A protein has these predicted regions:
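Generic signal for short, ordered secondary-structure residues
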Residues: 42, 107, 169-170
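Charged catalytic cores and adjacent phosphate/nucleic-acid-binding surfaces used
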Residues: 1-36, 126-224
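Aromatic/hydrophobic pocket-lining residues that form the small-molecule binding cavity
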Residues: 56, 121, 157
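Short, contiguous strand/loop micro-motifs
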Residues: 46-47, 110-112, 147-148, 174-175
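Alpha-helix N-cap and loop-to-helix initiation/capping positions
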Residues: 47-51, 116, 149-156
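Hydrophobic, aromatic-enriched interface-forming segments
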Residues: 60, 65-125
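Mid-domain alpha/beta scaffold segments of enzyme catalytic cores
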Residues: 1-40, 44-58, 62-83
Length: 224
């Protein structure tokens, strides 16, 4: 038979403060079923790509000037086709085992510039909607601060979802390999409370030794 599919994208959004939470968090925003030729969405993604590439190039030049020559095209990516700050640090350490702590701190210092290059949650949701798609909060218990994964508690997820609902989020990813049954149940309850649909995702990005593509679920209320 035929395979049914919809268009999809995952956007790493700019960090922002959420309600009463003390630390800014970056969420991953999923877009499903959109028109991939939509000019607003395409322009937003293209501009973000250009900003990010400029930051990485500036970082490479700064690291090179500090005595450790590197080129961004030479940096192996650990997550599919998405370059991450940790990839640059791993590349520097592999090429220069005796790299100074100052150089490592230099790499880390670019986290702020990279998150500022990202798309805001509000703009991301609006662009996905403009393209006729649905916006979904990916792996809600896992967010990021300065590109370091943060594990959230249920109350924190609840606070953030309240704001996301006001911004027009359509759904949340409730089925995720790392989530416990109780966590999934809590997310499904929140989805029902806010009238959101739920999705399942394996978070597979095409990388070797990173999880697995697809997942089984006995629920039937998912977009995919």
């Amino acid at each position: 038979g035929r395979i049914r599919y919809v268009t999809g994208t995952e956007i790493t959004c700019a960090e922002q403060l959420w309600g009463s939470l003390p630390t800014s968090q970056s969420i991953h925003l999923l877009g499903y079923g959109f028109d991939e030729t939509d000019p607003v969405l395409c322009a937003l993604l293209s501009a973000r790509k250009e900003r990010t590439e400029a930051v990485y190039q500036e970082l490479a030049e700064a690291v090179t000037a500090s005595g450790y020559p590197i080129r961004i095209p030479d940096v192996p990516m650990s997550c599919g086709n998405v370059l991450q700050l940790r990839d640059v640090m791993a590349h520097v350490r592999a090429a220069y085992p005796a790299v100074s702590e100052e150089a490592a701190e230099l790499v880390d210092s670019y986290a702020k510039a990279l998150t500022e290059a990202n798309i805001t949650v509000e703009d991301g949701i609006a662009a996905i909607h403009h393209a006729g798609g649905k916006a979904v909060w990916a792996h809600p218990y896992n967010c990021y601060h300065h590109f370091q994964k943060q594990s959230l508690h249920a109350q924190e997820v609840s606070i953030m979802l309240k704001e996301l609902a006001l911004l027009g989020i359509d759904g949340i990813e409730t089925e995720y390999p790392a989530f416990s049954d109780s966590e999934k149940s809590f997310l499904n309850g929140l989805a029902a409370e806010y009238g959101l649909f739920t999705t399942a995702g394996s978070d597979f990005h095409g990388s070797e030794n990173r999880d697995h593509m697809g997942m089984e679920t006995d629920q039937n209320s998912f977009l995919l």
